[in-house]
């Protein structure tokens, strides 16, 4: 059944609420805009009136975004703020554009991270999870989730996120749990999930397996220890080098390349393992690089993934020498219980004492660390659950190649393809308790194993109760189902039929593998369709110096603190302005301040309009008797609406917001409002027309700006609009051919260009606005400039205006535009000698700046050693000084005429 609210219901609720909390139509706006007074009130209004709620409507196209579910352990950071701001902009735009827009929210259970926090809290009470048992631990975990899991949601609301909170989901709620079991069983029955002994990545701190994608690699300074392994027959020794002497205890072979002439005669012989004195074979394997090190490799199948593969090929035994917390096992009494790094020192000392250590070399190498805690990962042979990836990767590659899903920017296709074309089976089992317990059951009586969606399985062979697998699933397993599990799958719900596939996924490039790829193959496998049409990739938010924000650097910025200082709209506007798809951006607080100043500019413009409207003012659309400047602003707004829609359609959100900024600040506030002031002061019909156009354009601007700055636009909308519909539910402006006054717009731009040129020249000559100047305008388009007489007088401080097709004033200062030359006699305005003295003094100071920057940039040492950012800043400084010098010289030349 389709549920569509009646528009009158929304209007009635809106009007009632406006009256109840003091939203008065055409109310007087306060002198200053205070976000703290407005934001909570506005958000409550939206929530109380179900403004975010999505309804299935056969007359509307659906537009769906699923939120990348933040961890319940999470605190809103700048990455979240950027991610959610971009999504909210798109959803608000589509909602206003007539779509049934659903932004589906939720949170992720974050298995390892959440369990770590709960275990730490228990440790303060002197408790362990093993000590209280799984059932009691899970009770504590759910209690922790209820207490702390909603913090991130409240923080998203502070940002202004217009999610449909009535549909909020959690990756471990009943519906998601049902979907997870369904998928696991389906994939297992197809042979795409299997259990086996493989070498996996083990985190000794988290004490769980992690997938290849969850390992971060970093260069670390280390050593090559060159060791002597004596031949068993006493005929000599073989030399090899290793970065991990502590794993020597588990060596089961040494390997050489079959084509290496140095060692051909040794293949098949045995060596004596130092310290352990166990005989191990010399095997030939093409894995060995002849020209690296000594061309000999020790093989430890239990502690290196490549060695594990060599071991399989040569049927070598697997000897594990470490416990789950990376300590030496009891089989080696001298080192038993030692941490791996302490054992390394002890073993190296013993090797030296035994005469097996030849030399030690410095060596930098890649070390894998756990993405959660940063601990060095230990390769470990273990029985785990895996997803067979190759059969799932093919359709996911094809879906992007055929355009069913596109990446924005397109260059991220390559990263996507690279991951899928080189993918390995996914280790999905984790040795933690908080998460989806694997639906596999074992019979201790007869050894039978059953994979089933049902709880409390009974052995089908012997009828005895079965115990469930202790392990849980990788957090990303449930996240991979997010686009359809949140809409009711595996049930074929009405929501699923209407809102799936979703439209846009907004996410960072750092989780393309973790999440995007896994959602792609999950959607294709279980729904038969891609999960989303478009993947919009954004970069990281870095600090002002371009560094990644991190706890270690202490350079993180709390979005909530910035919202407290400047308001949510200012933060959102800055994030949108600095965003270009796929690129990192820098967080610069001055830009947030500039965004707040922009909000204040808009507020003040609105106050001016409201203060100058008559009590009986009624907006009846655009009047018929428009002046040229009215047609100019209407036409420019009409084109702005067209371009903003095009930019949003192309995901150029930063471009759209820059155009809005320029139009509102420059075109509307600095020009059109100033142009209307004399008309409003004069009163009569021309004032009424100006007021009507001011309000009409303001309303349109508020609607265009609303997705970016929702709070202030909604507040002003309640004052300047006669509509009973709130701004969030109003209609987004689009291009209207009837409002395209291209001819008048072009004509008036010529007047604007002339006024701007006159103002600039007067400023360069240090002429204050209070001094009136004569203007002699030479132009072939006199009719256009005749229309601008009033504007030249008011905005260009013109006293006398002469318009002619020919002007001869060689001693006057000249302003040149594309259709006119404007002569300004300066004799009565400027004391030439005094002004020349000032300009020459300024010229000398600027020359010093030019010389300083030039000398710096001509210094090869500075250019080579200084940070690139500093060099570029110096170049920009030089260019600015040179530009200033050119203007000074131009002013001097004008005065010397």
Q: Which role fits each region the language model picked out?
A:
Residues 55-118, 171, 180, 240-243, ...:
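N-terminal catalytic cores of NTP/NDP-binding nucleotidyl/phosphoryl-transfer enzymes
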Residues 81, 238-256, 372, 378, ...:
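Conserved phosphate/anionic-ligand binding catalytic regions in large, soluble enzymes, centered on
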Residues 9-24, 226, 418-477, 481, ...:
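Feature 926 captures the class I aminoacyl-tRNA synthetase adenylation module centered on the KMSKS loop
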Residues 58-60, 68-69, 102-115, 168-176, ...:
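Short, solvent-exposed turn/loop segments enriched in Gly/Ser/Thr/Pro and often Arg
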Residues 8-78, 101, 358, 371, ...:
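Non-catalytic terminal extensions that flank enzyme cores
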